[in-house]
Amino acid sequence: MALKLGVIGTGAIGQDHIRRCSKTLVGSQVVAVTDINLEQAAKVVRDLDLGAEVYADGHALIAAPDVEAVLVCSWGPSHEEYVLAAIAAGKPVFCEKPLAVTAEGCRHIVEAEIASGRRLVQVGFMRPYDQGYRALKAAIDSGQIGEPLMLHCAHRNPSVGENYKTDMAITDTLIHELNVLRWLLDDDYVSVQVVFPRKTSKALAHLKDPQIVMLETVKGTRIDVEVFVNCQYGYDIQCEVVGETGIARLPEPSQVQLRSEAKLSNAILMDWKDRFIAAYDVELQDFIDGVKGGTLYGPSAWDGYAAAVAADACVLAQNTGAVVPITLAMRPVFYS
């Protein structure tokens, strides 16, 4: 029987998730939607021929008796409110990042979920579902390269809009690395420093770009992440793990290699959706299957909280230039 989903937020990512849940994935049916713009929500229902009901707000949708699980895809500052409401209603909830806009908000969600007695929350970090990252983790976990000593990473975008600010290099961009690198290493961060190289002429006046974020983990692994959001040439994600006896590298997306006009070339993707579209599909299918099977396995509320704590420290490091400690409480047994 199909899992009946209610979707809060019908912007770009909400529409993508509605489309994949209703047209691509198996075992789910979108029966309810809402958005701050109700006309847009109604248009999405018509355009995708959903037959879903449009609710006045997220709380009404969560309370609807035919909604069995909730997808929160709305404006970031509304996430905490709706996730807490879903937990209170005893309904599983998939929340796009951020889980909440503050670490304190994430902690409230963690506490509410623990009090509920079962895992109800999955956070929309999709990189652990990417085939390349999974292959990289398998190589690390196999012991083929010994213990990881250093990671060299890069997160590059061709360009960003004028509303993109310097701290968004952490909260919107690096946040993916903050999650996936913890997962890759099965380790937590203890400190961070951010330095600013020579600024690119392609960045707007208010934006410092590129940035280099240097992290240290509990086990002593050192990580450097280049965040360069005006690189011009493409959307490029890199991750190299230097171990005691070898090096493992994130594979490039599969692209046709072209020999033509005295050149050997591979295309570079220009958009994050193209790079990770398959991971989004696997991620949401895992949520659907987990809810139906009674156990969620994807990124947890604790993972969302850990990323938020690290992000807060990174922003402080941006502003001070100092090495900033990252203090994370011990992981509750509930999330072991």
Curated annotation (Swiss-Prot):
It catalyses: myo-inositol + NAD(+) = scyllo-inosose + NADH + H(+). One of its GO terms (molecular function) is nucleotide binding. SUPFAM superfamilies: Glyceraldehyde-3-phosphate dehydrogenase-like, C-terminal domain, NAD(P)-binding Rossmann-fold domains. It comes from Pseudomonas syringae pv. syringae (strain B728a). Its EC number is 1.1.1.18. Homotetramer. Pfam families: GFO_IDH_MocA, GFO_IDH_MocA_C. One of its GO terms (biological process) is inositol catabolic process. Belongs to the Gfo/Idh/MocA family. Involved in the oxidation of myo-inositol (MI) to 2-keto-myo-inositol (2KMI or 2-inosose). This is Inositol 2-dehydrogenase. Gene3D superfamilies: Dihydrodipicolinate Reductase, domain 2, NAD(P)-binding Rossmann-like Domain. It is an enzyme of class 1 (oxidoreductase). Keywords: NAD, Oxidoreductase.
